[in-house]
């Protein structure tokens, strides 16, 4: 209940005159320490396909007055409708009640493969109650999207040795919310390290939000030697944040463009 009053009023004195201060009010204050406010739980989680989540706040005992508490919203997820909707605010438990909820609304079910994200709600500055033991609640939005598939957009190509470079396109089946990496190894009948071309073993990174990247065979040498066509074979392996597709090997053929020599006595 709220604070209560006892009012004493003097009247009808005998052998005296009633003064101006003839009323006294005594206030019985309700002890705030009789109840505290806190979250029902410190953590919870749900798939991003869940459109909303109600987070319970409990009061240990009823009050004759409204109990309010401020809350601030942080976490790795982005609010304002990007991942969810919930702004900083004030929660109210009406007089006579022992609970209320803060609702995380408009949780977005996107198509991006991404890490699980959090919404962290922190209570502060309660009125008509003391702060309880659980003042921070972390809600985890669990991603429900499969990792994209990564592979070459074609398994073979060719070009004359007069073509100085060749970009090989690596595709993702869908954009990802995370950077995607994939290792590649270079083999074939052509000789690297600047003899026929330049390309060493390495790692390709496709940035979050992008759907493709390129591996460049560069410094292709246009020599004057008549020779067989030569190959540069690039093999993808060990992707992170993606699944390796079936077209994981690309063979680029360097086509010789020199005439055979003339032989005579």
Predicted regions located by residue number:
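Short boundary segments that mark the start of a structured unit
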Residues: 1-265
């Amino acid at each position: 209940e709220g604070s209560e009053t006892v009012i004493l009023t003097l009247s009808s004195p005998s052998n005296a005159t009633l003064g101006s201060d003839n009323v006294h009010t005594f206030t019985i204050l309700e002890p705030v320490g009789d109840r505290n406010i806190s979250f029902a739980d410190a953590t919870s989680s749900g798939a991003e396909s869940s459109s909303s989540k109600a987070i319970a706040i409990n009061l240990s005992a009823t009050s004759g007055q409204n109990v309010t508490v401020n809350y601030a919203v942080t976490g790795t997820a982005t609010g304002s409708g990007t991942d969810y909707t919930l702004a900083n605010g004030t929660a109210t438990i009406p007089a006579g009640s022992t609970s209320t909820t803060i609702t995380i609304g408009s949780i977005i079910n996107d198509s991006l493969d991404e890490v699980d994200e959090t919404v962290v709600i922190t209570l502060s500055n309660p009125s008509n109650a003391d702060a309880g033991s659980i003042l921070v609640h972390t809600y985890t939005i669990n991603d429900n999207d499969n990792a994209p598939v990564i592979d070459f957009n074609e398994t073979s190509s060719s070009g004359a040795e007069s073509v100085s470079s060749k970009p090989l396109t690596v595709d993702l089946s869908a954009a990802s919310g995370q950077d995607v990496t994939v290792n590649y190894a270079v083999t074939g009948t052509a000789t690297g390290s600047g003899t026929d071309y330049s390309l060493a073993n390495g790692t390709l990174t496709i940035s979050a939000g992008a759907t493709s990247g390129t591996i460049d065979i560069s410094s292709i040498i246009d020599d004057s030697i008549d020779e067989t066509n030569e190959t540069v074979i690039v093999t993808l392996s060990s992707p992170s944040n993606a699944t390796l597709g079936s077209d994981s090997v690309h063979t680029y053929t360097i086509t010789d463009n020199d005439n055979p020599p003339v032989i005579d006595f």
